[in-house]
Amino acid sequence: MAFAGKRLKGLIAATFTPMTSNSDINLAAIEQYVDYLVQKQHIRNIFVNGTTGEGMSLSVHERKSLAEEWVKQARGKMNDVIVHVGCLSLSDSKDLAAHAASCGADAISTVCPSFLKPSSLDALVLYLKEVASAAPNLPFYYYHIPRLTGITYQIYELLGKVKKNIPSFRGVKFSDVNLMDFSLCVSEYKEFDCLYGVDEQLLGALAFGAHGAVGSTYNYLGKKNGDMMAAFEEGNLQKARKIQCSLQEFLIFVFDMGWGLAEFKDIMSQVSGIPLGPSRLPLYSSMKFDHHDNIKTKMLKLDLI
């Protein structure tokens, strides 16, 4: 990915981290994973070591090993590998950012520490500037996910400040349902990539001008979401709405079961056939073997697979 000129767009899969049965990282599964995304889901961009990848539950050493393997296996097959480098420790985030640059990542992204939060928008900007400075030649994206971080500053206000302070800043992974804030980001800051991160509202974000989207469901529903985006771009709103509603119905089915990230990882294993292993504690999947047929039946009924 060139530092200037090229824009991130389209679907970006937020990858799960493959693990062994005892929750050690499983680098050997990544080659098969990349091939599945490219060949079956038509995905050409990935966001690694983020929320879906359980990045905050991994050690710095594990995250470096994963970044290296994702970059290695994606080379020649994918367009862009974005490495999430956010940590509770600023020094660890800078270490991961510098490592991402050295191993050939195409861009980096970070959340802000959420245990001891920034006391102001200016403090957040200073933090982001420090992280970005560790990899000044890599495009840098802020990861906004207030539901998990509790950091609720308006992003269109943030963009005005980072524009003046962080030369490598290229955009935001916007994982929030506030479409007014998102719309202002798109309309007021056209030089930045605004990537939407709430999968079940993607069509709404496209209507407001989203450049692309980062999400976990694009791992196993990437082709179907790609069909929706294509229908939208062609002006076939009826088809786009139909697909979005089917995707939403599937997610409602999953949420009504009380399931979350650990179970989504199980669904990815089931749909793809890739042994991704369990999630790392404190995440724990409550999915039972007899749920598998229910999931497949639901996806077939909704024409998702």
From Swiss-Prot:
Q: Name one GO biological process term.
A: N-acetylneuraminate catabolic process
State how it assembles: Homotetramer.
Q: Which SMART domains match?
A: DHDPS (SM01130)
Catalytic reactions of this protein = aceneuramate = aldehydo-N-acetyl-D-mannosamine + pyruvate
Q: Where does aceneuramate bind?
A: T51, T52, S175, G197, D199, E200, S216
Coiled-coil annotation reads none
Keyword Iron-sulfur in annotation = no
Question: Which residues does the entry assign to the active site, renumbered to this chain?
Answer: Y143, K173
InterPro entries xrefs:
Aldolase_TIM, DapA-like
Protein family according to the UniProt entry? Belongs to the DapA family. NanA subfamily.
Query: What SUPFAM superfamilies does the database record attribute to this sequence?
Result: Aldolase (SSF51569)
Q: Where in the cell is it found?
A: Cytoplasm
Q: What is this protein called?
A: N-acetylneuraminate lyase A
